[in-house]
Amino acid sequence: MSDPVLALRGLERVYKTEAGDLPVLRGVDLDVYPGEVVGLIGPSGSGKSSLLHSAGLLERPDAGLVALEGRDCSKLSERARTRIRLGTVGFVYQFHHLLPEFSALENVAMPLTIAGKSRREAEARARELLESLGLGHRLNHQPAQMSGGEQQRVAIARALANRPKLLLADEPTGNLDPATSTAVFQALYQVCREQGVAAVIATHNMELARYMDRVVALKDGHLELQRV
């Protein structure tokens, strides 16, 4: 078996509240491998977003190890963490956050041009991703001209533009109807498998969880393997 893209060991996260310390992650361990899509479930407030933010180097855990491609990132400087995050991790959120004045092609190409790619190279990669997600006919459409499901697929393409090794998605289909949610998830799953991207997807949708390679549940700050 290949080495994990993401490895969490003994992850702990505690928030300060007026009532005292609120632990949301208590010694979480998790490995995610190339091309594996892992579902993360749990009630609101259980710590799903905290786990994703820690895994994606957006937050520092209070204790524990976060390793990306075998490198412990827990004690690196913010500059080093940012560099690794930009090169290794893609994010998808419940809201697509597309720039309304740009086309689908331009939205997806933008992270590549920011990273120093030529316009030609950026647009070629953007076109490849959009076509793989069934949006080859929507390249020049702005977000307002697309359905919610199409907008979210553009957001997925944008997250994958820089060829990340890890994709973290926080309720990526939460604003979509059931049929559209399934279609978007299937497109996401397929492109992650094809490109060997490890993915962790937080969701409340148990129907979608059934399609994932593995599902883990956050309960009382601990991860448990979930049968679906």
UniProtKB/Swiss-Prot annotation:
Keywords: ATP-binding, Cell inner membrane, Cell membrane, Membrane, Nucleotide-binding, Translocase, Transport
Known EC number: 7.6.2.-
Keyword Cell membrane found: yes
Signal peptide: none
The keyword Cell membrane appears for this protein: yes
UniProt xrefs under Pfam families: ABC_tran (PF00005)
Membrane topology: Peripheral membrane protein
Binding site for ATP: G42, P43, S44, G45, S46, G47, K48, S49
Domain ABC transporter: 9-228
GO molecular function: ATP binding; ATP hydrolysis activity; transmembrane transporter activity
Entries under Gene3D superfamilies matching the protein: P-loop containing nucleotide triphosphate hydrolases
GO annotation, biological process: lipoprotein localization to outer membrane; protein localization to outer membrane
UniProt cross-references to InterPro entries, sorted A to Z: AAA+_ATPase (IPR003593), ABC_transporter-like_ATP-bd (IPR003439), ABC_transporter-like_CS (IPR017871), ABC_transpr_LolD-like (IPR015854), MacB-like_ATP-bd (IPR017911), P-loop_NTPase (IPR027417)
SMART domains: AAA
Cell compartments where the protein resides: Cell inner membrane
Entry function: Part of the ABC transporter complex LolCDE involved in the translocation of mature outer membrane-directed lipoproteins, from the inner membrane to the periplasmic chaperone, LolA. Responsible for the formation of the LolA-lipoprotein complex in an ATP-dependent manner.
Entry-linked PANTHER family: IMPORT ATP-BINDING PROTEIN (PTHR24220), LIPOPROTEIN-RELEASING SYSTEM ATP-BINDING PROTEIN LOLD (PTHR24220:SF689)
Similarity annotation: Belongs to the ABC transporter superfamily. Lipoprotein translocase (TC 3.A.1.125) family.
Subunit structure: The complex is composed of two ATP-binding proteins (LolD) and two transmembrane proteins (LolC and LolE).
Protein name: Lipoprotein-releasing system ATP-binding protein LolD 2
